[in-house]
Structure formats: structure tokens, C-alpha cells
């Protein structure tokens, strides 16, 4: 499921992030990937051990926890903590698929079900830099307002087109969902949204209760926790 989630961060939060990130020390993004990835990846990244990365990442995780649409769509179980990258001067990342299993700092492993990009630059701040996500329906071009999030299956082939002017700053991270199957997650998300709309429009209370029970029974059947 490819989903645009607006306003994860407020305009004030984005401005604070940018002020601090613009003054940060960035490293070559190729240092964070293997040989094959390094051939396609040309960007800068905030070092993994950076206190700023950890601090800003925590702010993002708190914002996600408060966002009902994100929770409904992702059904998050674990996160690989947010990281930060910057593309400028022709920086790009060719077509690739994210790794299936990632190591967490506590020694646990995370299965990458959902890939997330949180845009921190406004579209008019840079040229190029579109996130291209390829799936069975074709290629989808993504370039969102600062503070907005795109989520998509980690199994998707994707790339970042060259940034030919300005700088594209973003946060990116991965989620292991309680429901690993993307089709099942989408069905649950659609059902949850329908139930909420029925509640808001004064739908039949008994029918809403029954549908809510169906939702939770499906989640119980499909979830891995």
C-alpha cells in the first residue's frame, strides 16, 4: 500500500529540524551500504552515532505514535530508528530494494515490511529528487510538502532521481508491522477507516459494533506479536 500521510511534523518542527540539520556534519551515504548499494547511492547521511540523529528521531517516533492514520495503516510493531539524508549537486540513489532483515541496536532484528520517507524540504527548495516507487501498477512519482510522510511496501523497487539544484533533506526509516502481508494490512486499514466514518455519520450502532468485532478478529488471526 502506497499512502501519503500529511502533517506528521508541524511547520515549526520542520523549521527547527532544518536549522539544526543544516548545521550538522554529514558523511558519505555510501558508507552505510554494501558494495552493490554503494554503486547506486550518491548522497550524504547523518552519522548513525550522531546525538542529533537520535534526538530528532525520537521526536519523529513520538509524532508517529500520536498520528491515528499512521497507526491504522502501518500497525507498527518495531521501528528501525529514523535516519536522515541529504541529496544535492546531482546526488541520486538508483533503483534498489531495501534489505529484508535489519539489525537493531539492542541486538534484535527487524523484518522490513514498510519503508517510510518523511520529507523535510519543501518541493520548491530543490529540483529533481523525486522518489520513484515501482509496483505492479507502474511507477509512482512522489515529491511531498515538508512534514509529510510517504509509506510503501519495503518489497518495492524504488529510486531517488538526481537533485540538480538545491538540496533535498529527508528522514527515512523502516517498520516491522504486526501484519506482515501488505494486502491484509490494506484490508484492515480500509475496514478501520470505514468503521470510523460510520461512527462519525451516526451509522447503525449494532452494525458498527459487529464490524469492529470483525476487524479485531481479523487482526487477531493475521497479527504476529
Curated annotation (Swiss-Prot):
Domain (Fe2OG dioxygenase) ranges: 78-177
Cofactor(s) named in the record: Fe(2+); L-ascorbate
Highest taxon of source: Bacteria
Signal peptide start and end residues: none
Residues that hold Fe cation according to the record: 96, 98, 158
Record text on cofactor binding: Binds 1 Fe(2+) ion per subunit.
EC number from the UniProt entry: 1.14.11.-
GO BP annotations listed: DNA damage response; intracellular iron ion homeostasis
Gene Ontology molecular functions: 2-oxoglutarate-dependent dioxygenase activity; iron ion binding; L-ascorbic acid binding
Pfam families in UniProt: 2OG-FeII_Oxy_3, PKHD_C
Keywords noted in UniProt: Dioxygenase, Iron, Metal-binding, Oxidoreductase, Vitamin C
UniProt keyword annotation of Signal present: no
Positions contributing to 2-oxoglutarate binding: 168
Matches recorded under PROSITE patterns: FE2OG_OXY (PS51471)
SUPFAM superfamilies in alphabetical order: Clavaminate synthase-like
InterPro entries in the cross-refs: Oxoglu/Fe-dep_dioxygenase_dom (IPR005123), PKHD_C (IPR041097), PKHD_hydroxylase (IPR023550), Pro_4_hyd_alph (IPR006620), Pro_4_hyd_alph_FE2OG_OXY (IPR044862)
Name used for this protein in its record: PKHD-type hydroxylase Smal_0990
